[in-house]
């Protein structure tokens, strides 16, 4: 990670933490990234620009395209699951590689909004159609789902869509 991603992206405040600190443990990939908002935005911008950061190619465009392609064709997705509940769009092409394909063009099947939400309240997203990327962090006291129905896991995608609609390139 440091050599291939963090250093070329100038992510000076980012590293993965081990599962525990006793030694001999590999970094924890799911939820183990310690970073700053500025560093993470650099990563999102690189993905948005198909693997490029400034004049550097960090990932090949084909790699980003593969990450965002439907990896589990015709996945069984029950009505009312994450994408439909959060964004109102039911489709079975929700799984990319390390990314959720949240909003998909019905004609081409290409994802135009991707994300990688975490149950702990982190929600990075890219909306290619509107030219917007961002990162929400929500902290909810107690459990992740409240008696009034609020859930940071389902709430952040709604906020991302609202931000995309307000500041996106199609609205200027």
Which sequence ranges carry the predicted segments?
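Catalytic loop of the DD-peptidase/beta-lactamase superfamily, centered on the K-T-G motif
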Residues: 2-7, 12-172
């Amino acid at each position: 990670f440091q050599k291939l991603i963090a250093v070329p992206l100038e992510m000076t405040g980012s590293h993965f933490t081990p599962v525990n600190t006793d030694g001999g443990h590999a970094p924890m990939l799911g939820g183990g990234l310690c970073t700053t908002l500025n560093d993470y935005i650099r990563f999102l911008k690189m993905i948005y620009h198909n693997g490029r950061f400034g004049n550097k190619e960090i990932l090949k465009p084909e790699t980003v395209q593969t990450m965002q392609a439907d990896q589990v064709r015709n996945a069984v997705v029950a009505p009312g699951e994450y994408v439909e509940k959060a964004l109102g769009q039911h489709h079975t092409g929700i799984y990319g590689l390390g990314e959720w394909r949240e909003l998909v063009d019905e004609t081409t099947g290409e994802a135009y909004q991707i994300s990688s939400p975490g149950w702990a309240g982190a929600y990075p997203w890219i909306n290619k159609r509107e030219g917007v990327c961002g990162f929400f962090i929500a902290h909810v006291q107690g459990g992740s789902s409240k008696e009034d129905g609020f859930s940071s896991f389902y709430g952040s995608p709604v906020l991302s869509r609202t931000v995309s609609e307000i500041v996106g390139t199609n609205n200027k």
